[in-house]
């Protein structure tokens, strides 16, 4: 690369054809490398010798599910015992018990009847007792200019 002539600008290199020569040179190099890499990798191939006897073929057994009362259960039937259907009153009683255990109250109506004491009450002051605010709405700039009112 030291003996290569370097052009002053890319325009001179394009006019002299130097860029084209370099591109063709790089293209040839990449094509050579790709040809080398296209050859399949050398992997050792194991050839089995037919003269040696092979072991017996593997045996496949098809197993069935265990029978219950002499009947093979089909995949669609469920083997779980059916849960007894609970009445509405039983479900509500269980719900109330769980709610009492978790939240400490048996029904949601009890909470609604109680006023919420956690929030502090807001004390409103009459308009005339409030102190006037001394906020300057349109400040002046540091140099005495009109600040935000300044038009550009």
From Swiss-Prot:
It comes from the Eukaryota. It comes from Rattus norvegicus (Rat). Residues 42-107 form the SUZ domain. Keywords: Acetylation, Phosphoprotein. The modification Phosphoserine is found at residues 37, 39, 51, 105, 107. PROSITE patterns: SUZ (PS51673), SUZ_C (PS51938). This is SUZ RNA-binding domain-containing. InterPro entries: SUZ, SUZ-C, SZRD1. The modification N-acetylmethionine is found at residue 1. Residues 30-152 are annotated as: Disordered. Residues 89-100, 113-130 have a biased composition (Basic and acidic residues). It holds the Pfam family SUZ-C. Belongs to the SZRD1 family. The keyword Cell membrane does not apply. Residues 66-80 have a biased composition (Polar residues). Residues 111-152 form the SUZ-C domain.
């Amino acid at each position: 690369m030291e003996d290569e002539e370097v052009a002053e600008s890319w325009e001179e290199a394009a006019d002299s054809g130097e860029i084209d020569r370099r591109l063709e040179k790089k293209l040839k190099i990449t094509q050579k490398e790709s040809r080398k890499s296209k050859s399949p990798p050398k992997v050792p191939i194991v050839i089995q010798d037919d003269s040696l006897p092979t072991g017996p073929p593997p045996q496949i057994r098809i197993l069935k599910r265990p029978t219950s009362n002499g009947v093979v259960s089909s995949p669609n039937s469920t083997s779980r015992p059916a849960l007894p259907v609970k009445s509405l009153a039983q479900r509500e009683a269980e719900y109330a018990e769980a709610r009492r255990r978790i939240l400490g109250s048996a029904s949601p109506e009890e909470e609604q009847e109680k006023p919420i004491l956690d929030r502090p009450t807001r004390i409103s002051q009459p308009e005339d007792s409030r102190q006037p605010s001394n906020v300057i709405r349109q400040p002046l700039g540091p140099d005495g200019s009109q600040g935000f009112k300044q038009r550009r």
